[in-house]
């Protein structure tokens, strides 16, 4: 067993910082007031281009235990929704930023919550960013539930780009993209 950072903020933020240290990155989210939150912030601060001033503290840091089948590479995630489940549209920066990458739809309950005007709180956050001229990216998490078609389309309306795997794409569209191990083509 080993400890690794993960999630949209850590994965996308650190990858961009490694690719081009001149890109200014604002990490936005919540981490716990615990050792795991301290560790996460310390790791992000190792990158001078990552600004963590929009990361708030409270509760217990969220985490996932990931089980991987070596023979097939299949992964199963067991997630504890902790501090990052507090994230709301009000937590996002209001200044004009060139790109907003929001992840993950179907994992952040506050952002998946209903909004009278936009459908979901995540859709509201993306719409507000677009209104300021920000390019928006929606990242979706894999799950086995039936919420893909009821939650994701609201936010999808306000996403310039979409990060999904084939399973997520099929679930959002209501299509089965595979027949056994064969990818369907129509």
Task: Name what the model sees in each region.
Residues 30, 38-57, 62-186:
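Ribokinase/PfkB-type carbohydrate-kinase core domain
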Residues 1-26, 35-45:
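Glycine-rich phosphate/adenosyl-contacting loop at the front of the ribokinase-like
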């Amino acid at each position: 067993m080993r400890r690794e950072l993960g999630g949209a903020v850590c994965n996308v933020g650190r990858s961009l910082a490694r690719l081009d240290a001149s890109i200014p990155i604002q990490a936005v989210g919540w981490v716990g007031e615990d050792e795991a939150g301290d560790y996460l912030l310390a790791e992000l601060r190792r990158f001078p281009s990552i600004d963590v001033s929009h990361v708030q503290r409270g509760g217990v840091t969220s985490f996932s235990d990931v089980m991987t089948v070596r023979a097939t590479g299949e992964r199963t995630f067991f997630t504890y929704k902790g501090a990052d489940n507090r994230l709301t549209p009000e937590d996002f920066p209001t200044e004009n930023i060139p790109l907003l990458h929001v992840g993950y739809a179907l994992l952040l309950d506050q952002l998946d919550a209903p909004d009278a005007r936009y459908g979901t709180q995540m859709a509201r956050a993306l719409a507000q960013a677009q209104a300021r001229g920000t390019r928006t990216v929606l990242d979706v998490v894999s799950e086995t539930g039936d919420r893909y078609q009821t939650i994701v389309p609201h936010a999808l309306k306000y996403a310039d780009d979409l990060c999904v795997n084939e399973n997520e794409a099929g679930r959002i569209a209501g299509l089965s993209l595979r027949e056994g191990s064969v990818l369907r083509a129509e």
